[in-house]
Amino acid sequence: MDWMPLVLAAEEAESRGFSLNLNLLETNIINIAIVFGLLIFLARGYFGRVLGERKSEIENGIREVENRGRQAEQELATARQNLSQAQVQAQQILASARTNAERVRAQVLDQAQIDIARVRETVDQDLRNEQQRILTQVRLKVVGDALARLRERLPGELDEATQRRLLDRSIQLLD
């Protein structure tokens, strides 16, 4: 590299009041300090603003996540409470259904007993009626047969005096 043009430019600038120090040990430390100082001074506001915005975004994100977490916890608590109430209600419905089923079963059994008793009574009444009808038929048959035999025997055995006595006795029995 050719240092000569730089040296000439530095000498000319020095003659006018501004000069470059070409001593590498002195210039690097001073230049670095100046650049760092300017960088810190100028960039502090920009980086402070950028970092502040980023910090604000992160804080807002954290608050939003915390709010959603609290809301989720509240919804979970509500859901658990609803589940508990639903379980209690289901147990009540089940108990009520069992009670109703037992009551209906008892009513059906009672009604069946009543119906069985009614059928037995009807059967007994029908049997008594049938027995009565058969007895009546037997009596009528016996009386009919007796009358038929009597009619066969009476004309020869019954004279007028016997007929009067029978009539008188029958009249007395009616009084």
Curated annotation (Swiss-Prot):
Main localization category: membrane
UniProt subcellular location: Cell inner membrane
Record carries keyword Magnesium: no
Pfam families in the cross-refs: ATP-synt_B
Record keywords: ATP synthesis, Cell inner membrane, Cell membrane, CF(0), Hydrogen ion transport, Ion transport, Membrane, Transmembrane, Transmembrane helix, Transport
Database matches in InterPro entries: ATP_synth_B-like_membr_sf (IPR028987), ATP_synth_b/b'su_bac/chlpt (IPR002146)
Highest taxon in the source lineage: Bacteria
Gene Ontology CC: plasma membrane; proton-transporting ATP synthase complex
GO molecular function, a single term: proton-transporting ATP synthase activity, rotational mechanism
Keyword Cell membrane assigned: yes
Database matches in SUPFAM superfamilies: F1F0 ATP synthase subunit B, membrane domain (SSF81573)
Topological relation to the membrane, as annotated: Single-pass membrane protein
Membrane-crossing segments per the record: 22-42
Role summary: F(1)F(0) ATP synthase produces ATP from ADP in the presence of a proton or sodium gradient. F-type ATPases consist of two structural domains, F(1) containing the extramembraneous catalytic core and F(0) containing the membrane proton channel, linked together by a central stalk and a peripheral stalk. During catalysis, ATP synthesis in the catalytic domain of F(1) is coupled via a rotary mechanism of the central stalk subunits to proton translocation.
Similarity comment: Belongs to the ATPase B chain family.
Subunit field text: F-type ATPases have 2 components, F(1) - the catalytic core - and F(0) - the membrane proton channel. F(1) has five subunits: alpha(3), beta(3), gamma(1), delta(1), epsilon(1). F(0) has four main subunits: a(1), b(1), b'(1) and c(10-14). The alpha and beta chains form an alternating ring which encloses part of the gamma chain. F(1) is attached to F(0) by a central stalk formed by the gamma and epsilon chains, while a peripheral stalk is formed by the delta, b and b' chains.
Protein name, UniProt field: ATP synthase subunit b
Gene name linked to the record: atpF
